């Protein structure tokens, strides 16, 4: 009865304005508390996704297993050293001779420097499949500093149904990946790479971690575990304790009608991989690829046997050499060479416009171009004489890079690449651009020279006979970036364009000594001040940005002090301005569109005013200018 009376009085209570306000305030407070609580629950749930020490998965759902296995990628991505695969990021691993698309499972071979890449009808990698469709989670990443693609898959264990097999551990059955609970996961990690120091070699490393109490099994699908590809014949080679498959065939004709003979040696792999409970499997599959020069199909029959014999002997010899090496040593050798090759580069610090490529775009472009470039300097078969010749070619300054900077050339630094074929076309464009801009010597040196030319071109650096000059456009220094590892004599120079607290740009230069100490000097535009000796001090050296009239380079670097001192007398400048003074002169004030809009509004206003006056005195029913005394209507 009391409750009924209170409910009858509720409409009257709510009719009060202060009561409605209080009710709305309480409702808003409840909503805020609910959202805060759900956010805290989500945060707590996110922390619980990593239940395994050191990133090792245990019994959990595939998504939680994947989160733990890929947790270390986050810091690599923040440093620009790793890129997740996705739209606009082709899954390419290459070494200048071999190019492999991991996702599409395709192989390209470049027979010669000026020959187009050929695509043999050969499936390059082994595919690992569970024995039945099971829930799984996976992710792939390009590790730019290691030169490989890593794919991680977390596979949830299948159930084998009722019966003795489901009661305890046992071999995998055809009904699932494993026997046992459906909440157990195994971690599969695969590394794909084309070896940087051995141009004919690529490999796939398979690591399967089974932390459960059951046996895990995966079926292998690929040329090393099944029948030979359609265009190839295969033979099993046995030498001592080693055995491998030798495939022989030919590539499809290139547009000119010529064909190439192809021989592939591949390590033999079993049809099914099984891992005992609480153990790990580490298996490395090796391939060696050799191709012939272009052959006319009409003379192929007469030359095929002899050419194939030569290619088979080369592939057999290299495969036996690889099988004698520990697989871990082969992988570490590749990572060491790739890290050495990728030490120079471009670091984007702050971008203030839409036309400058992002750090991700720059790093991906450098990775793809390095992958497509041969590196003869890294070959173990190179003689000392040949190595010295290539080193001298790489250290020869030439006149690279002539012309304006390529920083804003969107066709050279594309924000999106759709396929491996597009990457190969981009590499041809980069090579042609560098050759036409005075970098022929660097291009001949292979991947280290290509990278040096790309770094020089990005910032507008150019070597001359006596110095290295930084000739960036003063109007585009609002972006902050750093160029690392520029070869000069026997040292490496790092040059950065930075901004102070007021937004004014300045230059920061540091030197990394490599071997014999050589004095290096630098002076800013005009060289009016005495050149400064660059040292390997950690803090480096800073230079203000000065702009000359007419425009000359912003910075000069040389080992010849007298040359820099003489420059001030040979430049013949009209004026030297600070960067902000130059920009003030370049700034035309308000944009043209603003003034055009103001002028249009003023014109329209006067036209409207003229129309009013015209309608008042000249339009229909307009009043006369003078009164007529005889007109009674006036």
Curated annotation (Swiss-Prot):
Residue ranges that the Swiss-Prot or TrEMBL entry lists as coiled coil: none
Stretches of the chain found on the membrane's Cytoplasmic side: 611-634
Protein name: Uncharacterized protein KIAA2013 homolog
Residues with attached carbohydrate: 363
Localization, UniProt: Membrane
Main location, first listed in the record: membrane
Transmembrane region(s): 590-610
Domain of life: Eukaryota
One GO cellular component term: membrane
Statement: the UniProt record of this protein carries the keyword RNA-binding: no
Membrane topology: Single-pass type I membrane protein
Extracellular side: 41-589
Organism field: Bos taurus
Pfam families per record: DUF2152
Signal peptide (UniProt feature, chain positions): 1-40
Keywords carried by this UniProt record: Glycoprotein, Membrane, Signal, Transmembrane, Transmembrane helix
